[in-house]
């Protein structure tokens, strides 16, 4: 296997990975495939969603602008990336099933300190209010974004809706209005 992988270019390996992913997850709702053990998980991801074997609860899900950008060949292009599209497709599948709504976010804050951008999981420091644990430089805008995100996630955990009482800035993602909340510092 090692020799085979070393004889191929990264682009070839990535292309083959995407082909295989398309085979095991044809709807491309989300890019992670569970391990079906026939005990805890008795069916695949697509079957669970399309047959309504998932909980009827509100969902909040999203991606970052530079998700999964380990190598230039693998770097997703923002809204064109598979994770971004998968979040929208998941929301639309819930709507088709008549389920509670999904709220989708797109974290675009390019973190300061290097050129990694808004990399996978970079939103977590903001969401959990742990910016001070990061070595990266921050601005007042970063702390304001963190407070906004903590409020949104707290509201969602309490009510199933990220909006504070009396507000409706963050809309559910639906077929008629595929809304995605962009999270970044205010300029």
Which residues fall in each region the model found?
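Short, flexible, glycine/charge-rich loop motifs used to bind or transfer phosphoryl groups or to couple energy/partner
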Residues: 3-4, 47-51
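Mobile cap/lid helix-loop segments that gate and shape the active-site cleft of serine hydrolases
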Residues: 23-48
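Single conserved hydrophobic/aromatic residue that forms the stacking wall/gate
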Residues: 1-14
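C-terminal helix-and-tail extensions that cap enzymatic domains
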Residues: 12, 17-29, 50-187
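Short glycine- and Lys/Arg-enriched binding-loop motifs that mark or flank ligand-binding interfaces
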Residues: 7, 34, 58
């Amino acid at each position: 296997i090692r020799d085979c992988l070393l004889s191929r270019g990264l682009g070839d390996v990535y292309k083959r990975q995407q082909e295989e992913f398309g085979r095991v997850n044809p709807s491309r709702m989300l890019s992670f495939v569970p391990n079906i053990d026939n005990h805890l998980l008795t069916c695949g991801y697509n079957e669970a969603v399309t047959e309504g074997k998932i909980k009827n609860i509100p969902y909040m899900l999203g991606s970052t602008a530079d998700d999964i950008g380990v190598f230039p060949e693998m770097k997703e292009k923002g809204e064109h990336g598979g994770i971004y599209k998968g979040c929208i497709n998941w929301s639309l599948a819930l709507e088709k099933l008549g389920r509670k709504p999904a709220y989708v976010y797109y974290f675009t804050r390019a973190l300061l300190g290097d050129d990694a951008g808004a990399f996978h999981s970079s939103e977590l420091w903001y969401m959990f209010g742990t910016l001070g644990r990061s070595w990266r430089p921050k601005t007042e805008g970063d702390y304001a974004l963190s407070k906004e995100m903590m409020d949104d996630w707290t509201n969602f955990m309490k009510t199933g809706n990220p909006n504070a009482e009396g507000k409706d800035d963050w809309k559910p993602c639906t077929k008629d209005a595929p809304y995605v909340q962009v999270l970044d510092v205010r300029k």
